[in-house]
Amino acid sequence: MKNVVLLGATGSIGTSSVDVILQHSDIFKLYAVAANSSVAKVAEIVRKFKVERVCMFDPNAAKELEKELGMKVLAGMEGLCELAADPKADIIINALMGAVGCLPTITAIEHGKHVALANKETMVMAGPVIWDKLAENPKSFITPIDSEHSAIFQCLSGRPEKEVEFLEITASGGPFREWPIEKFESITVADALNHPVWSMGKKITIDSASMMNKGLEVLEAHFLFHIPYEQIKVVVHPQSMVHSLVQFRDGSLMAQLGAPDMRIPIQVALTWPDRLPLETKRLDLPTLAKLTFFEPDFNKFRCLALAFEAGRRGGIVPAMMNAANEVLVDAFLKGNLKFTDIPKHVETIMTGAPTVTGHLTLDQVLEADDEARRLTSALIK
């Protein structure tokens, strides 16, 4: 029996993770959970699964949940990291949203844990730091949960990076794939939240609409699989059945297909290299009709181009890009700026980002994150 710590238990990835654990309760125990502020949802999970440890990122929610459950509830970043380091924990599922997921990932690695990673911001902000931590803690390892990175992980199956010609990361294209760029000025929050394929949280749905999410995935792929940026491509695939592809140097092109159901990559991340039964929809190839693929429009989806640029510049630029984007998406969701302001202001922050030479440290990453948030907030006041 493996004890699972689920960070981000009430989001879309967290909910799917709970279902996978429920389907394999003979193998996994939901030992600890963390969430931001959803007291009722967490209380329900704790009671149903007899969860032993709990953390709420919001201190007020932690106090409320403590009264509700009559048990100690940890709070804040300190609480998240305490769960990530728990001696009884075997697997840490990091399904937290945004930069808040970075420190718990690093803590888990430092304590030799298996990290099932859905928090792409960890790798975007601190990829070189993660490389160092994994080298220092050989017992620890990461399995990716994002469907695209899970697909690449499965296609590679441990093959050395020298055999890879390029990675091809698929993108649905989001709700604005067929919109003319002239209409982008009028995009509303409701328009951007109307994703054609996936049901996700608001922040990642906006990132998908701007294709920043795909840009973050490019950086994550670079750091997860040690593949140079010039060997990573993005292809728009509206049906979202092919989750990503690997072109090998011998001419073989390997793809991973599956229904757009996050429970599949979650289970792969938890059980690899074993494949266990899972109650989910199967693809029926004759009914698929056709699968289509297009080049992305980097002019229309400027965020994707900016992410490639951030990756190539390296240093603290990816962390600053990510932080600026988080602030801007939040402002857009609150109706305080236009959709087209997101790439415009991200570019402004990136332009002013200093070049960092030498070894990137965690302190530099966290300082860059704070500075970019301060600058972006001032920019949109």
Where in this protein do the model-derived segments appear?
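Catalytic, metal-anchored helix/loop core of enzyme active sites in primary metabolism
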Residues: M1-K381
